[in-house]
């Protein structure tokens, strides 16, 4: 079991660089991203862990399905396909489907989330 509680000490994350280093595109500011995979690997069909980003805005098209819960900070996520914007704070969660393009607007100095990512696999022939 890997617990994520709002009042627990935070795990040290690894520097992942800029949004461009993870396949996103910076829209505003100079955000930096970091994280730690705690379950599975980048090549696993299912992985999970922690992710953080600093103040700024970036666009990403999700290559996986994700369920995430914000642990720290405040951000707005905008689904570019529908135009829906939702503001999240600590304890709030979301689900994003593969192929969805989202604008991340980090409104606090930084955010941290826990996540579970599921990469779609091709159906057998």
What is each residue range found by the language model?
Residues 1-45:
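A short, N-terminal "cap"/entry segment at the start of jelly-roll beta-barrel domains
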Residues 37-62, 97-98:
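Conserved short histidine dyad/triad with adjacent acidic residue
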Residues 56, 90-91, 99, 109:
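Tight coil/turn sites that cap or link beta-strands
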Residues 82-98:
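Short acidic-glycine-tyrosine-enriched beta hairpin
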């Amino acid at each position: 079991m890997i617990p994520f509680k709002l009042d627990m000490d935070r795990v040290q994350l690894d520097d992942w660089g800029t949004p461009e280093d993870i396949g996103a595109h910076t829209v505003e500011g100079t955000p930096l991203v970091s994280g730690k995979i705690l379950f599975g690997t980048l090549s696993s069909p299912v992985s999970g862990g922690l992710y953080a980003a600093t103040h700024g805005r970036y666009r990403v098209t999700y290559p996986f399905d994700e369920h995430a819960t914000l642990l720290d900070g405040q951000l707005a996520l905008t689904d570019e396909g529908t135009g829906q914007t939702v503001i999240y704070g600590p304890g709030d969660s979301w689900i994003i489907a593969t192929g969805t393009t989202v604008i991340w607007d980090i409104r606090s100095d930084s955010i941290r989330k826990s996540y579970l990512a599921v990469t779609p696999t091709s159906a057998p022939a």
